[in-house]
Amino acid sequence: MRTLWIMAVLLVGVDGSLVQLWKMIFQETGKEAAKNYGLYGCNCGVGRRGKPKDATDSCCYVHKCCYKKVTGCNPKMDSYSYSWKNKAIVCGENNPPCLKQVCECDKAVAICLRENLGTYNKKYTIYPKPFCKKADTC
């Protein structure tokens, strides 16, 4: 019950590219992003960092590194345009350069999560942060 309350708090007031990211993840994996990846492993979700537990968690680690390279906008809050065409994510051509980067980061993690669905391990779905070992920097 406490976990559901925490997830609800995390979702309040969320807009911008996080919502777009969650939509991309659902489109690519068929999984609800917040529920399945919000606290997955050591790297999926806000404020989580550590040595990846598996390939799924590695997708999130690489995504965080991708966001660190973005300058000029807020990757978690600023909205961008994209479309879903023929079961593929297409980042909008009219996005400013910074938001093109954010969209490409989000697209890459969504595809990575789909490609690694076979490594998804339910024991890491709500993984305790204290069990995460320090990871290398990006």
UniProtKB/Swiss-Prot annotation:
GO terms for molecular function: calcium ion binding; calcium-dependent phospholipase A2 activity; phospholipid binding; toxin activity. Gene3D superfamilies: Phospholipase A2 domain. It is found in: Secreted. The active site is at 63, 106. The keyword Metal-binding applies. It catalyses: a 1,2-diacyl-sn-glycero-3-phosphocholine + H2O = a 1-acyl-sn-glycero-3-phosphocholine + a fatty acid + H(+). Ca(2+) binds at residues 45, 47. Residues 1-16 form the signal peptide. The keyword Transferase does not apply. Binds 1 Ca(2+) ion. It is an enzyme of class 3 (hydrolase). Its cofactor is Ca(2+). Its main location: secreted. Disulfide bonds join 42-132, 44-60, 59-112, 65-138, 66-105, 73-98, 91-103. Its EC number is 3.1.1.4. Pfam families: Phospholip_A2_1 (PF00068). Keywords: Blood coagulation cascade inhibiting toxin, Disulfide bond, Hemostasis impairing toxin, Hydrolase, Metal-binding, Myotoxin, Secreted, Signal, Toxin. Snake venom phospholipase A2 (PLA2) that has low phospholipase A2 activity. Shows anticoagulant activities, strong myolytic activity, infiltration of polymorphonuclear cells, and edema in stromal tissues. Induces cell death of Jurkat cells in a concentration dependent manner. PLA2 catalyzes the calcium-dependent hydrolysis of the 2-acyl groups in 3-sn-phosphoglycerides. PANTHER family: PHOSPHOLIPASE A2 FAMILY MEMBER (PTHR11716), PHOSPHOLIPASE A2, MEMBRANE ASSOCIATED (PTHR11716:SF9). Is expressed in Amami-Oshima P.flavoviridis venom, but is missing in Tokunoshima P.flavoviridis venom. Belongs to the phospholipase A2 family. Group II subfamily. K49 sub-subfamily. This is Basic phospholipase A2 BP-III. It comes from Protobothrops flavoviridis.
